[in-house]
Amino acid sequence: MKKTLVAAAILSLALTACGGGSDTAAHPPSAKPEAEQSGKLNIYNWSDYVDPETVAAFEKETGIKTRSDYYDSNETLEAKVLTGKSGYDLTAPSIANVGRQIKAGAYQKIDKAQIPHYGNIDKDLLKMMEAVDPGNEYAVPYFWGINTLAINTRQVQKALGTDKLPENEWDLVFNPEYTAKLKSCGISYFDSAIEQIPLALHYLGKDPNSENPEDIKAAVDMMKAVRGDVKRFSSSGYIDDMAAGNLCAAIGYGGDLNIAKTRAEEAENGVEIKVLTPKTGVGVWVDSFMIPRDAQNVANAHRYIDYTLRPEVAAKNGSFVTYAPASRPARDLMDEKYTSDASIFPNKELMEKSFIVSPKSAESAKLGVKLWQGLKAGK
């Protein structure tokens, strides 16, 4: 993806993040599926990525029975869909994996005629996705968000001996001066080379999406220097650990970190979580619904995709999972506490310093995974 496209896309998203509806009808007439299939829909999705009430309402409205399984990393999803015969009708990969999976023949094209609410999708997201899905033929944006970090404010203050955070808040998880102190209360990294290495590259001032082997090695070596201070590697478990006070700093998905914050508040356990948005920038991504090549309930998958693009449904899902929905009209229906939160809807200043987590070549991805596995093993 060209840097000029990246800059234009993320800035445009920031400028329209809290904008009004799309230029198409928010509630077009429903489309009839081309062919009746079974009354089932098998979904493979990220954990904590939908309001259960919207799923129940979909089942009641359509008579379609859904079954959902969950993954916590793009690597896990990719391994499943590339082997074929996954047994799923719908998945939600991230932008960094979409292009490679399309080229591998893992998905079938969508039929936009069966998605009347397609026009509600933020056009800037569609432009961003065209870099990996030319013509937007396979992927339908669902949510977009950021990779950032959160802290347990009381534990961090105690460990640092001050309530003042470093000017570059990424120092908390990458700089030995700070990680050595936070080791006592627990630091968590992503359990994903695809997500973690770009953040380390960005911290070093290098191209976050660099495929230069020396850059990738430099990023991993930097993390090796603090490996002994990292308590765990997790792409979803950090939610409950942060909420319970078992970690004091975690790198994660913005929405998941906000879920941890909400769970701690609901538990009234004295844990105070703050989701940070470092002014030096964060990673930006888009997750899209896609239909596997061997899906058995294709019409039902289209019906569900269309359902999630309804403004009221997208707003309800977005508020529940604390991520920005792809449906622009939905944003007008969300409470200001969500739309004004930079960890959910990043502002212009943050987006100007941020980067899109872009696809990697097979060779670069292989190197990243190899070095990442060595890092986790302490080698």
Protein language model annotation of sequence segments:
Residues 287, 292-352:
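Mature extracytoplasmic/periplasmic domains
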Residues 19-22:
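Bacterial signal peptide processing site
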Residues 27-35, 99-144, 166, 171-174:
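Hinge/lid segment of periplasmic solute-binding proteins
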Residues 27-101:
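Early extracytoplasmic/lumenal segment of secretory-pathway proteins
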Residues 348-379:
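Conserved C-terminal helix/tail region of periplasmic/extracytoplasmic solute-binding proteins
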Residues 188-276:
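Ligand-binding pocket segment of bilobal, Venus flytrap-like solute-binding proteins
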Residues 14-17:
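C-terminal motif of bacterial Sec signal peptides marking the signal peptidase cleavage site
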Residues 108-119, 171, 267-283, 292-295:
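Short beta-strand->loop
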